[in-house]
Regions:
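RNA pseudouridine synthases
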Residues: 1-170
Length: 170
């Protein structure tokens, strides 16, 4: 009954799989947008990367500068003009023969943040040609998965956690 509403709360990079949240009412959308903008959400990603990072777990802090012509972000260790601070925390889930699986907790949500920051420590994501992996995946995806998203329900004020299953081909 009545009009149907669906508002986009956040986005994922095109080749990324996983959780995405939509608001079902026009009242919920600005509330959810605010919780994302104020970093009141907890975002967990899984990635398969080429090399083992220097530490089994760490916090990466960079200043990302976006190049719109290339649709790419560059990670800098020091602040540069027009850059934005980017913070993520990672730990190793599993070491495989050729790859390493990481769990990433995203503190900020910048353009291509995980991709740029992991590439900056010589850990490009499997299939991600743009950020230094040597070959693409057959389907054009990258091995970056938005695994879990926790946030406060915009009306009920209860914590919600949504977990996305891992794609079968991973």
């Amino acid at each position: 009954p009545g009009a149907v509403y669906l508002g986009v709360v956040h986005r994922l990079d095109r080749p990324t799989s996983g959780v995405i949240v939509f608001a079902r009412t026009s009242k919920a959308l600005p509330r959810l947008n605010k919780s994302f903008a104020e970093r009141q959400t907890k975002k967990t990603y899984w990635a398969v990367v080429k090399n083992s990072p220097p530490k089994d777990s760490d916090t990466l802090t960079h200043f990302l500068k976006r190049n719109p012509k290339q649709n790419k972000s560059y990670a800098n260790t020091k602040e540069v003009p027009d850059s934005k601070k980017a913070i993520l925390h990672y730990h190793i889930l599993k070491k495989m023969q050729r790859y390493v699986a990481l769990e990433i907790l995203l503190e900020t949500g910048r353009h291509h943040q995980i991709r740029a920051q992991l590439a900056s420590i010589n850990c490009p994501i499997k299939g991600d040609l743009k950020y230094g992996f040597d070959r693409s995946n057959k389907d054009g995806s990258i091995h970056l998965h938005a695994r879990k998203l926790s946030f406060m329900h915009p009306v009920k004020k209860e914590e919600m956690t949504i977990t996305a299953p891992v794609p079968e081909d991973v």
